[in-house]
């Protein structure tokens, strides 16, 4: 029987709630009035993630007592209709229904356009009314822009004009990716935002930075002396950062075709993880010290060249047992027949500094692959002066599995049990659901929302981080488009194009295929 996995909808234990509240007291005044405004309240992100996350935090008493949630969108909605749209995703238990009703009482809705002032003025009136209800205490404001990039500029401009605090409270703006389409558009967006808000008011959210195992990267690196001496080019052969999905584009093909997997996943999620793997130890756990070190990594990274990239596009595989497998990417009616948008990409990043020179970083991501997982795989070099028969020793690997089944394990060689002296691969395994059975790991959005409330920007993307990340990938994106590079076809449910494996082999990655980690059973 597999060990029980705690759902993100499970309540956090009372002891942990008290501990969290105590640690938050320094940065969060629980009695002060707050408004959390969701722009794009009728959209999928709001229904599937934002409202459910706010409910879980509210249920667990981790939000300020005096808070109001305001949805804003163009749709003609009531609070009742809004509730219907997200309630099933909140997974409310029978004994939580009264608390959920209290949560809904704190929700309201403002209908308005994004490109005119009238709706924003109504929003400000709603905030003013809330302030009057709160004995005229100044209201802290959090604005979540769960919107397409096409309206970022106009919405942020109207916000600045109509809905800012008056200096006796604070305003924070949360921006959802994509943060631009390339280096130029990203810089234009950043320049626009800089005219309206200070850097400490802007929270560019990359939910991968809130995941438990991504958070664990810094602790693993800088909290364990045993790893520090080997974390460099003398001992590490390569680093592979993977993001694999076992489903296709589904209903997102129209949007996805304008972006592609490099913009959708590699430029943000994978590049952020790369910086955490490669950065030097920061001077402190202060947000700016950490982000300074991440920027140094991005500055040292070379621009990715076309010869170091493989792009692919999935095709139908009717024989594969999956409801989407009978349809390839271009079989979707919303995708142009001549689309060259990649659904798979592998890029090799080279970091030109003393620690990492000569160590390839493989960024690999794709849809419709053979499994769903995200992981960081550190492959170490061979043992010097090998005394065992040729080929018996395999490279050791440290693997941090981000999702699913969060785990850290070290693949290494041990003696085969018995009378002989043969060796075999095994692992030292820390599977979170096995080791921490009673702990419910927080959802990434829960963690990040709390950090915005507390004013912590450790896990949010700074302007210069964004610029240097785009600098690395924009030239190859432009070259792929200019040369109309045809993606390599791969079957739905496969490992992806074999050309990707060949490119990794070219740079020294060794895939033996003799060992596979299996999530432990109880």
Curated annotation (Swiss-Prot):
Catalytic activity annotation: D-glucose 6-phosphate + NADP(+) = 6-phospho-D-glucono-1,5-lactone + NADPH + H(+)
Main location: cytoplasm
GO CC list: cytosol
Residues noted as binding NADP(+) 2 in the record, renumbered to the chain: 364, 373, 377, 401, 409-411, 429-431, 495, 517
Keywords noted in UniProt: Carbohydrate metabolism, Cytoplasm, Glucose metabolism, NADP, Oxidoreductase
Location(s), subcellular: Cytoplasm, Cytosol
Gene Ontology BP, a term: glucose metabolic process
Gene3D superfamilies reported for this sequence: Dihydrodipicolinate Reductase, domain 2 (3.30.360.10), NAD(P)-binding Rossmann-like Domain (3.40.50.720)
Binding of D-glucose 6-phosphate, residues: 177, 207-211, 245, 264, 367, 372, 403
Entry's transmembrane regions: none
Pathway: Carbohydrate degradation; pentose phosphate pathway; D-ribulose 5-phosphate from D-glucose 6-phosphate (oxidative stage): step 1/3
Ligand binding (NADP(+) 1): 40-47, 74, 177
Catalytic residues of the enzyme: 269
GO terms, molecular function: glucose-6-phosphate dehydrogenase activity; NADP binding
Enzyme nomenclature, EC number: 1.1.1.49
Origin superkingdom: Eukaryota
Purpose of the protein: Cytosolic glucose-6-phosphate dehydrogenase that catalyzes the first and rate-limiting step of the oxidative branch within the pentose phosphate pathway/shunt, an alternative route to glycolysis for the dissimilation of carbohydrates and a major source of reducing power and metabolic intermediates for fatty acid and nucleic acid biosynthetic processes.
Stored NCBIfam families: zwf
Assigned protein family: Belongs to the glucose-6-phosphate dehydrogenase family.
UniProt protein name: Glucose-6-phosphate 1-dehydrogenase
Gene (UniProt): gspd-1
């Amino acid at each position: 029987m597999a060990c029980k996995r705690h759902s993100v909808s499970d309540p956090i234990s009372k002891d942990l709630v008290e501990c969290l509240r105590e640690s938050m007291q320094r940065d969060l005044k629980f009695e002060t009035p707050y408004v959390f405004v969701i722009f794009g309240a009728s959209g999928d992100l709001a229904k599937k993630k934002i409202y459910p996350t706010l409910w879980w935090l509210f249920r667990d008493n981790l939000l300020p007592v005096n808070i109001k949630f305001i949805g804003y969108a163009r749709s003609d909605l009531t609070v009742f209709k809004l509730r219907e749209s997200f309630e099933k995703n909140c997974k409310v238990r029978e004994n939580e229904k009264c608390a959920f009703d209290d949560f809904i009482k704190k929700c309201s809705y403002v209908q308005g356009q994004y490109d005119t002032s009238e709706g924003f003025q109504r929003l400000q009136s709603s905030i003013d009314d809330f302030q009057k209800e709160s004995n005229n205490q100044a209201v802290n404001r959090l604005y979540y822009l769960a919107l397409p990039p096409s309206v970022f500029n106009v919405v942020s401009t109207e916000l600045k004009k109509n809905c800012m605090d008056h200096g006796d409270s604070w305003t924070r703006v949360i921006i959802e990716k994509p943060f631009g389409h390339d280096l130029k558009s990203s810089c234009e967006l950043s320049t626009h935002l800089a005219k309206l808000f200070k850097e400490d008011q802007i929270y560019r959210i990359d939910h991968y930075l809130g995941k438990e195992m991504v958070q664990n990267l810094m602790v693993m690196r800088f909290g364990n002396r045993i790893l520090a001496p080997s974390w460099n080019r003398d001992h590490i052969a390569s680093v592979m950062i993977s993001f694999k999905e076992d489903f296709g584009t589904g209903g997102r093909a129209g949007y996805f075709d304008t972006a592609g997997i490099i913009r959708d996943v590699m430029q943000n999620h994978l590049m952020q993880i790369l910086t955490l793997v490669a950065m030097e130890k920061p001077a402190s756990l202060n947000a700016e010290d950490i982000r300074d070190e991440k920027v140094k990594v991005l500055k040292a990274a070379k621009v990715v060249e076309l010869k170091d990239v493989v792009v692919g596009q999935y095709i139908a595989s009717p024989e594969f047992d999956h409801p989407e497998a009978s349809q390839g990417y271009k079989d979707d009616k919303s995708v142009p027949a001549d689309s060259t948008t990649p659904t798979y990409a592998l890029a090799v990043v080279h970091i030109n500094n003393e620690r990492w020179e000569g160590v390839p970083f493989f960024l690999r991501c794709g849809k419709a692959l053979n499994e769903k997982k995200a992981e960081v795989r550190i492959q170490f070099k061979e043992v010097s002066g090998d005394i065992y028969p040729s080929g018996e020793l395999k490279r050791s690997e440290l693997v941090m599995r981000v999702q699913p089944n969060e785990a850290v394990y070290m693949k290494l060689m041990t003696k085969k049990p018995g009378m002989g002296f043969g060796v075999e691969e095994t692992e030292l395994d820390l599977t979170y659901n096995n080791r921490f059975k009673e702990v419910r790991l927080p959802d990434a959005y829960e963690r990040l929302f709390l950090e915005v409330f507390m004013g912590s920007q450790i896990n949010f993307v700074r302007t210069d981080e964004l610029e240097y990340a785009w600098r690395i990938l924009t030239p190859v994106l432009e070259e792929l488009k200019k040369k109309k590079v045809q993606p390599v076809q791969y079957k739905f449910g496969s490992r992806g194009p074999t050309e990707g494996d060949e490119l990794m082999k070219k740079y020294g990655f060794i895939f033996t295929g003799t060992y596979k980690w299996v999530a432990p059973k109880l």
